[in-house]
Amino acid sequence: MANTVYENFFLSNIVEDQFNSHLDLLPFCTVDNTLEGVAGMKRVINTYRATDGTEKLTVGEGNSKSIEVNYTPVEYVIALAQNRFEWFDEDAMKDPMLVPVGLKHGATDMYNTVQGDIYGEFAKTGLVVNATTPDFDAFVDASGALNLENIEDVKVFAFVCPKDKAKVRKALKDDLKYVEEYAKHGYIGTVAGINVYAKQDATEGEIVVATKEAVTIFTKKGVSTEQITEGNRSEDAANKRKNTAFSRKYYVVALTDESKAVKIKLTA
């Protein structure tokens, strides 16, 4: 498909926001740079789960069950995410905005793809806390469902979609505190030791609560780029004055510890 360029008249250039979400999820997961292999190769990753074991007892009673931890080997395929942007010399001469916008969107599109996979792994968790409203008790129950030995030493976070953000603020009121230490793009506040962030493309009606141990991204390196432009084009591309830019990333994203992620499911 050919690029759309503007004709030769005065134009105010407005570049639309192309990010699905500005909240970067890499700080919220474990990054492992030891990935080996090529696209299509399989990697087996153990996903850990823990069963509940808390019981309310009377005098003389003991627990009838214990917390049990087990794992399931899950097979993942190494992904190669790649995008391509093509333009002709004449396009750039006619519209100076075309190439910068196209190259920038190559990076943005890659970012959206990887970020979507990371959030998708968090959302796979089978631990669910049902709540009619996202109030203080709902977040406390979610925190309690996580397999945490010492919550004081662990950073717990939550992702909420913009449509549910107002519900969270309304339900929590003064229980939602603003802590400067955790302030970053999308930060709403902290409740029950959980830092709550708004994520533009999070699922409505579901609030993911987790620690960074829940999801791991296995990667070789960052995004690599390749440009085929004047001076290194093939004879055919040079003859047509055609340029091409590629962005690539090899990675696997996995829910490596399901006991470290829980969803608050709003049932109202």
Where are these regions (language model features)?
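N-terminal "assembly arms/tails" that initiate or stabilize quaternary assembly
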Residues: 1-72
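Extended oligomerization regions of viral-like shell subunits
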Residues: 140, 146-227
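Short acidic, glycine/tyrosine-flanked loop/strand segments centered on an H-E-D-like triad
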Residues: 69-93
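Structural beta-strand/beta-sheet cores of well-ordered domains, especially the beta-sheet scaffolds
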Residues: 41-43, 83, 154-156, 192-194, ...
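Extended, compositionally biased alpha-helical segments that mediate assembly or anchoring
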Residues: 233-268
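Alpha-helical scaffold segments that mediate packing/assembly in large oligomeric complexes
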Residues: 86-153, 263-268
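Short, ordered beta-strand-loop transition motifs
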Residues: 39, 199-204, 233-241
